[in-house]
Design a protein with these regions (language model features):
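Flexible, compositionally biased loop and terminal segments
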Residues: 1-246
Length: 246
C-alpha cells in the first residue's frame, strides 16, 4: 500500500466519519460477551485514529454512543461509560502535546452521563481548543435529530426569525469542522441510524461487511479508494455529460 501516493491524492476526503458497528456481533461469533467486543473495538479505534492522521485527513468523526443506546442492557451501558472514561484519559495523555483538537458532539448536559465522563470531556475540549491541526470528533450521547432540534432552538433563543442553512450549520456541534465528505459504516448494515443527518446530506457512504474490531488499515484504504473513484455531483451534472447522455 503506497501511503504517500494516497496521502497526496487531491481526491482524498478532508472529513470522514466512522460508524463503528458490529462489536457485539464480532464477540458473539467467538462465544464472548458483547463487552469484550467493545473492548477490542476501542483498541482498534485508537489504531485507526493514528492511521487517519497519517493519511493527512483533517477531520475524523466517530459514532461512539447514540442517544438511543441508553436502551441497551445496563451492564453494557456501564461498561461503555467506563471505556469512554478510559478513552478520554488516553486522549489527554497521548494528544495534548500534538496538534490535535478534540470536539465532542452530543448532549453533555444529560444527567445519565457519569459526571467524571462529562467533566473530562469538557476539560479536554477546553485544553485543545487552540489546536489548529487534526480534529477528532467523538460523538457520545449523540443523535442527529436531537442535534438539529437543538440548533433550531438555539437560533430561536438568539432571536432569529428567518433561519438560513448557514445559521443551522453554525449552531451544530460540528460547526467548526469541515463539510462531511465520507461516511463508513462497518458490519454491512445500511442505515444512517440518526448519525450526522444534516452534515451527511451530500456525503458519500460505504458499507463494508466487516465488523468493526476486524476492520483493518487495508480496509480503510480500500474504502478511501472507493470514495476517490466516485464522481461527486452534489445534485448537478456537467453540460457535456448531459449532451452525451441525452
Amino acid at each position: 500500500m503506497n501511503i504517500e501516493k494516497l496521502k497526496n491524492d487531491p481526491r482524498m476526503p478532508k472529513h470522514i466519519a466512522l460508524i463503528i458497528d458490529g462489536n457485539g456481533r464480532w464477540a458473539k461469533q467467538r462465544g464472548w460477551a458483547r463487552t469484550i467486543g467493545h473492548k477490542y473495538g476501542f483498541e482498534n479505534l485508537k489504531k485507526q485514529i493514528e492511521f487517519v492522521r497519517d493519511l493527512g485527513i483533517k477531520n475524523l468523526s466517530v459514532y461512539c454512543f447514540s442517544a438511543e443506546n441508553w436502551n441497551r442492557p445496563q451492564k453494557e451501558v456501564n461498561y461503555l461509560m467506563e471505556l469512554f472514561d478510559q478513552m478520554l484519559d488516553d486522549y489527554e495523555r497521548d494528544y495534548l502535546d500534538k496538534d490535535i483538537r478534540i470536539i465532542i458532539s452530543g448532549d453533555m448536559a444529560d444527567p445519565r452521563l457519569p459526571e467524571k465522563v462529562k467533566a473530562k470531556a469538557l476539560a479536554l475540549m477546553e485544553k485543545t481548543k487552540s489546536k489548529a491541526g487534526f480534529i477528532l470528533n467523538p460523538c457520545i450521547n449523540y443523535g442527529g435529530k436531537q442535534e438539529i432540534l437543538k440548533a433550531v432552538n438555539d437560533c430561536i433563543s438568539e432571536g432569529l426569525t428567518q433561519i438560513s442553512e448557514q445559521d443551522m450549520t453554525n449552531h451544530l456541534y460540528s460547526a467548526e469542522l469541515l463539510p462531511l465528505d465520507f461516511v463508513i459504516r462497518t458490519s454491512g448494515e445500511k442505515r444512517a441510524s440518526n448519525f450526522m443527518l444534516w452534515q451527511s446530506a451530500y456525503a458519500e457512504w460505504y458499507y463494508p461487511k466487516t465488523y468493526w474490531p476486524a476492520f483493518t488499515k487495508h480496509g480503510l484504504v480500500k474504502a478511501l479508494k472507493n470514495y476517490m473513484s466516485r464522481e461527486r455531483r452534489f445534485g448537478s451534472i456537467k453540460e457535456d455529460k448531459w449532451k452525451r447522455e441525452f
